[in-house]
Amino acid sequence: MQSIIIRQYRFLARYLEPEFVKDPALRNANARPREKLQRLSHIQFSELLTDVADELQRRINNDPKVRFLPPVDSYHPKRNHARQKLSSLAPTRLRDLCMDVFFEVQSRYSGALKEVSSNTPPNMTRAASQPPPQVQRLPASAPKHDLYSSANASSASLHPTEQRTTSSPTIPSYANRTHTDSPTSLSHRLPNVPDTNALNTVQANNSSTSSLSQGAQTGIDSSSNYLSRIEMLESSLAKSNSLLDSSKSEMEALKAKSISDATKHKNEIFQLEEKLHEASHEAEISIKKLNDAENRIKELENNPTLSFNPELEKNLKLMQELIVAESSKTQHIVELESCIDSLKAETERWKKVAINAKSAKIDEDIRLFTMTTVPMKSIRELISPNGFLDEQLYIRYFVEMNVFVASLRRDSPSQWMSTAKDIALTLEAIVSSLREKSLLEELPDLGKKVDDLCSFTNSLMEQVRLAVINGALLPIYHVDASACSISISLMDIAKTYGLTNTGKSSLSVGRNSLHPVDDLKALSVAKTLLSEKSKQFSETNQKLLDAISSDSSSSTIQQRVHEDINVIRDTLFDVSSPLELMRDRAAYAVIHNALQEMRRYCMQLIEQEGHGENFGFTDNNSVPPLTDLAFSAAKCFKDILRAIEDAEFSVQRTQFSTR
């Protein structure tokens, strides 16, 4: 182990030689913060020294195929993860780490390094009296702020534990260090190991220092633009989260208010009914007394001898007062009955208001993912006769993006690619139509926005591909940021150039409604729609087979394949819309498997379409010939129709058994 440490120490000494010549203050070992390295055990420090030397050698080799240190089976998984994260360090951050490790080796193994000290090149101890060497200019696409932030994030996750010697080594934090490098000292690549003529090269490159200052200023301006775009995306995400929170709080408040109002009205109605019952009982008693009094009055009128009785006069006055009192009670009872009727009407009105508000809140919003909403009212306002963007594709994108982001948080990484391909297919159709419009109308600004949309899409697909390969090591918020960039760019195009109404079927809106539907009705609608799409596909598929049999040109065959793909994609989108809300999930699963089979054939047709003139002669043996794909796709329509009929029978049998 001692010989390995000495060899790695010499390697670090050769790499740090130009840095010490450029700035002699870096050689002051006592001024460097190495407290975290001093707390490491010898085994942990030797692991850190090995990892830093391997990363330095990888950057010197500059192999584009090796973007990070490959994992070693004998190492702990945490250590392999830490070795991979070393590739995210900026060159200056790696240089500082190498210096700390270099001086820590001197401090720990001072006795064993006497031989190394005698063999150290003399220009390692030479003062920095000569001007600094010329370095490569920092590219505009790599801002300094982003480099430092990624370095801090990488170094913070590599702290080992003292008990587990196989864990990853600790890399100290350099967030509070004052860098003495000039703005031009940041280089995109790690400098190669210097030779014996390094100092002569330093003097020869001194004349180009002024030109590098101007290049550094350009890099700083580009970095500021990139930071401003990041801040814009962060503000959009924050605004979207606030909109979602306000929508949720509004729905909860409306629900709580409706429940409290219903409880209050129910209690009031119950109390009024009790009062009405008591008043009715009292009214019956009063009516009975009134009838007795009237009969007594009639008897007195018929018998004149009793008319001058003073007791009778007193009783008559009491009866008249009783009649007036009972009349007022009867009037009060009538008022109570009218009040009860009004309260019942008010309760029903509030119920309708709550139901309508909830329905409007669900139907008038298209959920992007979990962060923001796009009102349907704003989409309708963007529709114009001269619009460029297809409204159906615009809504389909947001629906598929919702499915994709939900899959990110629910499914495994292996299932992310299928939902991402749906988004890519929809965006490919959008980009094709927009490019055609930009060329016909000669709109360079639209072409630039379409290029940005393509770059964001490629970035999203690359991130998903890396996440699937590496087992979701990539943070999920990176994918969310790319998805948000695509949505913002697409909404900007829609606001600038408008939408065009292509007569979208009402069945496509089924994804936007969360109301429960009848399973038989949904299956009937899907069956009707599938029959229409099957006839349309039969016509386009027959044209494709005729073009293949007549040896037509590759462009003609490619156009026929593209027509088949469009019909299949529309079928997958429209047929699945009413079926996704079915209550019988077992019946829906059978249809879903048939739809997935059709989706697979659609992807194979797209792969065939991309080969251009080499139709039927692909390098991928897993893709069947074009004619077989055409017949298989036609068979999928029959399989889906048969699955829908089986689901109808299953649903009818279930409903009959529950009656």
Curated annotation (Swiss-Prot):
The Gene Ontology terms for molecular function here are:
MAP-kinase scaffold activity
Q: Which InterPro entries match?
A: GIT_SHD (IPR013724), Spa2/Sph1 (IPR039892), VBS_C3G9 (IPR056439)
Q: Where in the cell is it found?
A: Barrier septum; Cell tip
Q: Where are the transmembrane segments?
A: none
Sorted alphabetically, the Gene Ontology BP terms of this entry are:
actin cytoskeleton organization; establishment of cell polarity
Residue positions of the PTM Phosphothreonine?
Answer: T184
Positions the record marks as coiled coil are 237-303
Region Disordered: start-end pairs: 114-220
Please provide one cellular component term from the Gene Ontology annotations of this protein.
mitotic actomyosin contractile ring, intermediate layer
The answer, when asked if Phosphoprotein is one of the entry's keywords, is yes
Does Thylakoid show up as a keyword for this record? no
Could you tell me where the Polar residues compositional bias lies? 116-128, 158-187, 194-220
Which UniProt keyword terms apply here?
A: Coiled coil, Phosphoprotein
Organism superkingdom: Eukaryota
- Which residues are annotated with the PTM Phosphoserine? S129, S167, S168, S182, S242, S513, S555
Quote the protein name from its UniProt record: Uncharacterized protein C3G9.05
Q: What is the lineage of its organism?
A: Eukaryota, Fungi, Dikarya, Ascomycota, Taphrinomycotina
